[in-house]
Amino acid sequence: SARAFASNFDDLNLKKAIHYAKVRNVKAHLTLNTLLKDEELQDAISLAQKAYEYGIDAIIVQDLGLATFLHEHFPDLPLHASTQMTIHRLEGVKKLEKLGFSRAVLSRELSLEEIEHICKNTKMEIEVFVHGALCISYSGQCLFSSSIGARSGNRGKCAQSCRMSYTLLEKDVETNKEKTLDTGYLLSPRDLCGLEYLERLIQAGVTCFKIEGRMKTPEYVATVTRIYRKYIDNILAGHPKEIAPKDQEDLLQVFNRGGFSTGHLNSEANQDLVFPQKPSNMGLYLGNVSNFNANKGLISLPLNEPLAIGDTISFEKEESKYMVSELMIQNKNVPKANSKDRVTIGRMKGNIRYWR
């Protein structure tokens, strides 16, 4: 989790946010999903009490001590078990029900069949992740960041160690020589996209879908929510529809790491789950550069996607990003270009390497 780096709510803004949601008929949930130290418990209780008084609809928790206290003192306050609790089987869900929880956010590591089995055998509300970043380890249980970066993922300070570049070596036990097998972002998972499984999950009895959006832009939240809401409503109305290419493209454009993964929903093989070429947003594939004039700062290429002045582009194997400020077709400046147009992009000054 990277929650410690987010712009979190203070008391006043929390109250305003809850009111903002209420007047728009939207539920507001507060996340207190971390394991607490003794000296932190009172602050957590105080925050939960304020949220309760402000009219919060539910609190998402991981710490069983905090959950027990909240259930005893605020029995009408719905408690949701965080995915950080690693609820991965039916017995765990049944235990949570006895402890006073009303909903369980299941581990992201479960398959469709496992989710269906749990839903079929409990009356408890079940929530599952359908979109966003995945952990290479069990969510909330990874000590990788703590071990090599001294930053606890569980405490909200994940160093994103799985997003770093690594070299896989094979050592010959007899000669003691090492051979490089692979190099890249070998532990970096693609983002989850469960759009194609919504109907099956709804039929299974899943109560709520969760979108991972920590540290994402408002555009990301709006785009992903809009698209998932559209297909959920279609299914609930009895008119499920095929995923439109434009919707898939919008999801890719707003954020993707080398395309999407179906994660553990269909027990995807690790080779498909991980994208070793780049750990950050890839955007859409624009095309292959056919000509690069470093002195004039010009690049030419046939477009695979539309492009316009103000769009941001990047290059494979490069970290820098560039805003398009000059766009030409046949030496004439244009505000935008369509897919399959051959364009020249100007003013491309900077540390650009031309890979052949």
For each of these PLM feature ranges, what is it?
Residues 1-3, 15-52, 61-65, 73, ...:
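Surface-exposed amphipathic alpha-helical tracts and adjacent flexible/coil segments at the periphery
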Residues 9:
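Long C-terminal interaction/binding lobes of large macromolecular proteins
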Residues 69:
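Basic, amphipathic alpha-helical recognition segments used for DNA target recognition
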Residues 86:
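Beta/alpha (TIM)-barrel catalytic core signal, keyed to glycine-rich beta->alpha loops juxtaposed to Asp/Glu
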Residues 90-91:
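Conserved nucleotide-cofactor-binding alpha/beta core module
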